[in-house]
Amino acid sequence: MHTKTLTELKAGLAAGDFSSRELTEHFLARIKQYDGELNSFVTVTEEQALAQADAADATLATNRASSSVSGLLTGLPIAHKDIFCTEGVRTSCGSKMLDNFIAPYTATVVEKMAAEGAVMLGKTNMDEFAMGSSNETSYYGPVKNPWDLERVPGGSSGGAAACLGARLAPAATGTDTGGSIRQPAALNNITGLKPTYGRVSRWGMIAFASSLDQAGPMAQSAEDCALMLQAMAGHDHRDSTSLNEKVGDYLGALKDDIRGLTIGIPEEFFPDTLDGAIADNSRDAIRELEKLGAKVVSVSLPSIKLSVPAYYVIAPAEASANLSRFDGVRFGHRCDDPQDLEDLYKRSRSEGFGDEVKRRILVGAYALSAGYYDAYYRRAQQVRSLIRDDFARAFEKVDVLMGPTAPETAFKLGAKKDDPVSMYMADVFTIGVNLAGLPALSMPTGFINGLPTGTQIIGNYFREGQILNVAHKYQQATDWHKQAPAFGGAQ
């Protein structure tokens, strides 16, 4: 059953080929057998999952008897990134700071998917507070890449991507602040979508950088991501950044024709320094879409080269404010025997946060400090406006933009741990999308020495249906997304 896509599993449940309990037990058994080596889960919610599966089976049986329509995700097992609050279940955000935090409420994303009948398998490992590109900053240890256990799965949604790559779950939720859905999707040979900023509610999602964070689906195929987004998307009055925009018919959009669609190729996404094999895989994907009737033109995003430095001012600045609430007073790790309030703050935060989180808090506080605000934070926001304008000009000429998702394949565990700048460059092609608030998807487009590569499709605001359709058409013509690693008998 684990070789089937989410969409295929949905059809099997509807037809009565197997029950949700059988399906859920199958994935729980795989997690139990293989995740000790992979470390992709922080918490497995076995009892809750089986109870939800039994309830789903009852719903499916009733609906089959009455020819009624079940929820979009009824009976389908899904893993949630451990950044989404889940009532009564630990929500750690990959940090010692929240190691014992039991959320008193459930995030909107989890709530909406549960309302559509989804079964929660558990909570996936992640870089601490979503700060990282390799899933090595987690308090619970690094996640391994199922294609090579000596390599990283990418981050920060590395646990979600790795468990999907190894077929320990058919689908998962992730979050993307600078590439945290798309980069690990590329490194694990899965499909991942970052929606338009505000398309999916952030309520109950622990904040890293509030103007950049966005939740999205991760799965084997674009069709699966469309199914998940249909359940996740929508306005939420509890989230002030949620946009009251009509939810599209994402599954219906997969039937649209792409003949005449114009694909823009930003020259900045194919620099001379890029690994030639990665460039070739993405160019091959673009050529495949040309065969299907799409047109290709060259475009330029001149300010995109400034995206990484701008991001690493804006995101840490927002993080320094968001993480100030974790002080050991109301919740979070509290040090033993504090001498006074100042000692409580200092030691609780020093003990609770890891090195990368501390680094970003310091950088962010510095950028916002008197005398440096104009030199760094204000200037970074001006660069952000330039990047947004570059994308707007490009979309006057084209429908979508395409290029490699990541500049390299999965690197060795520990290879960049002492070189933060090198680690930050892992998101060089993805960060600009977050700064502009655009939707983008990563899809599998080949291998280099047995390691997956991905190609990114960027769309205009609220054009998720279009980029999902482009990816779906490509996946109908190719089988890269069907390739699975030898690990855990995923093939």
From Swiss-Prot:
Tell me the gene name. gatA
Sorted alphabetically, the Gene Ontology cellular component annotations on this record are: glutamyl-tRNA(Gln) amidotransferase complex
Q: Give the function comment from the record.
A: Allows the formation of correctly charged Gln-tRNA(Gln) through the transamidation of misacylated Glu-tRNA(Gln) in organisms which lack glutaminyl-tRNA synthetase. The reaction takes place in the presence of glutamine and ATP through an activated gamma-phospho-Glu-tRNA(Gln).
* GO annotation, biological process: translation
NCBIfam families the UniProt entry points to: gatA
Spell out the reaction equation it catalyses.
Answer: L-glutamyl-tRNA(Gln) + L-glutamine + ATP + H2O = L-glutaminyl-tRNA(Gln) + L-glutamate + ADP + phosphate + H(+)
- Would you tell me the protein name for this molecule? Glutamyl-tRNA(Gln) amidotransferase subunit A
UniProt key word Cell inner membrane? no
Please give the InterPro entries that the UniProt record associates with this protein. Answer: Amidase, Amidase_CS, Amidase_dom, AS_sf, GatA
Q: Which UniProt keywords apply?
A: ATP-binding, Ligase, Nucleotide-binding, Protein biosynthesis
Family matches, as SUPFAM superfamilies:
Amidase signature (AS) enzymes
Q: Which family does it belong to?
A: Belongs to the amidase family. GatA subfamily.
| EC number(s) per entry | 6.3.5.7
Subunit record text: Heterotrimer of A, B and C subunits.
The protein's superkingdom reads Bacteria
- What positions constitute the catalytic site? 81 (charge relay system), 156 (charge relay system), 180 (acyl-ester intermediate)
Which molecular-function annotations from GO does this UniProt entry contain?
ATP binding; glutaminyl-tRNA synthase (glutamine-hydrolyzing) activity
Q: What class of enzyme is it?
A: ligase
